[in-house]
Amino acid sequence: MPKHGKKYRSAAALVDRNKLYDPMEALELVKKTATANFDETIEVAYRLGVDVRHADQQIRGAVVLPGGTGKEVKVLVFAKGEKAKEAEAAGADYVGAEDLVAKIQEGWLDFDVAVATPDMMSLVGRLGRILGPRGLMPNPKTGTVTFDVANAIQEIKAGKVEYRTDKAGIVAAPIGKASFDVERLAANFRALTEALLRAKPAAAKGQYMKSVTISATMGPGIKVNPARLTATAEK
């Protein structure tokens, strides 16, 4: 039984596995490899020269992609009083406090991002074991613990994505959909790369961006030349 289907093999045949592609060339190619019968997500994986065993070399943050993500995002906000009203006015999908905590404890998780005002974190902390492993716990580093709930909601709805290093020092994040034109994907790719360059830990030694791979949901990986990518982002 073949490991991959015919569509994947046809897409993989377009990619030179030994080549480091120019960023724009890689984006044009990844669109050609997206052959599934749905609008595939385009994702980038950066292998960074960081030692995540040290807390000061763990990278976590968020960036607003100028071209958006192409995804409808459901935002939940933990807030009370005036801040709850602000959240509702800004377009939050769910707003509440103890009621939402109880609902989540019962197994409800129909949202993509959670935001909380700082005064709500003692309450939200009860959900650590549920939200933490799913990457849904509000965090000041990603701008999801804030009193400026309206701005947080607007940024998330506009295309804010979170990123963090995993145990292997890899950051993987989406930069849009296969239906996006190359220029829109390029703007998002650049924004994400710039954010990671700004987040470089002072203690990181040697080459920072060791490898960069771009792929569609069901497609093969395409290696991007890190030096060309860094030079493009720093212009």
Swiss-Prot record:
- Output the Gene Ontology terms for molecular function: rRNA binding; structural constituent of ribosome; tRNA binding
Q: In this record, what's one Pfam family? A: Ribosomal_L1
Presence of the UniProt keyword tRNA-binding in the record: yes
Q: Which GO terms describe its cellular component?
A: large ribosomal subunit
* Annotated GO biological process: regulation of translation; translation
**Which InterPro entries does this chain map to?**
Ribosom_uL1_bac-type, Ribosomal_uL1, Ribosomal_uL1-like, Ribosomal_uL1/biogenesis, Ribosomal_uL1_3-a/b-sand, Ribosomal_uL1_CS
In terms of superkingdom, the source organism counts as Bacteria
Q: Which UniProt keywords apply?
A: Repressor, Ribonucleoprotein, Ribosomal protein, RNA-binding, rRNA-binding, Translation regulation, tRNA-binding
The text of the family note is:
Belongs to the universal ribosomal protein uL1 family.
Known partners and oligomeric status: Part of the 50S ribosomal subunit.
- What's this chain's function? Binds directly to 23S rRNA. The L1 stalk is quite mobile in the ribosome, and is involved in E site tRNA release.
What name goes with this protein? Large ribosomal subunit protein uL1
Which species is the source of this protein? Symbiobacterium thermophilum (strain DSM 24528 / JCM 14929 / IAM 14863 / T)
This protein's gene is called: rplA
